[in-house]
A protein has these predicted regions:
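Short coil/turn segments at beta-strand junctions that form active-site/ligand-binding loops
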Residues: 1, 57-59, 117
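Acidic, metal-binding active-site segment of PIN/NYN-like and related structure-specific nucleases
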Residues: 47, 55, 59-80
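Acidic, PIN/NYN-like endoribonuclease modules and their adjacent C-terminal/linker elements
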Residues: 7-26, 34-44, 73-131
Length: 131
């Protein structure tokens, strides 16, 4: 599974992916994290553009801070464009704890792996908060 890492989680993603690898999950569940830069996506892109790019490329958007209000907010885009086949957006509930709390980070890893292993169950779910 490929994850599009929101620009506000770029540094966090390194720690997160390291925890996934340390726990041995990458040997069992192929996962790849890609950045906005790797996708030629501006960090100033609106949520509609980001969501569409992720869906078109079969990537799960991993974020901690996307807008909830406005015509191009992530929430509005998902209401308008989400289908039963859409991949969910995964939102880390507390990005600071992801960096600083190994127990919390471990729970985030478990949640992420569970979602990937059973991705078809989560299609169409719009947004999933972890942990």
């Amino acid at each position: 599974m490929i994850f599009l890492i929101d620009h506000n989680l770029k540094g966090h993603a390194l720690v997160f992916l390291g925890a996934i690898a340390t726990q041995g999950w990458l040997d069992i569940v192929p996962m790849q994290f890609v950045t906005f830069a790797e996708m030629d996506l501006s960090i100033n892109s609106d949520d509609r553009t980001v969501w569409r790019l992720a869906q078109e490329n079969q990537m799960i958007l991993l974020t901690a801070n996307r807008s909830m209000e406005g015509k191009d907010s992530l929430e509005q885009v998902m209401r308008e464009e989400n289908t039963s086949e859409s991949l969910p957006v995964i939102t880390v509930s507390n990005a600071d704890r992801l960096l600083n709390d190994s127990e919390y980070r471990g729970r985030c890893v478990e949640s992420l792996v569970e979602i990937v292993l059973d991705i078809d169950t989560y299609r169409g779910a719009r947004r999933i908060f972890i942990p």
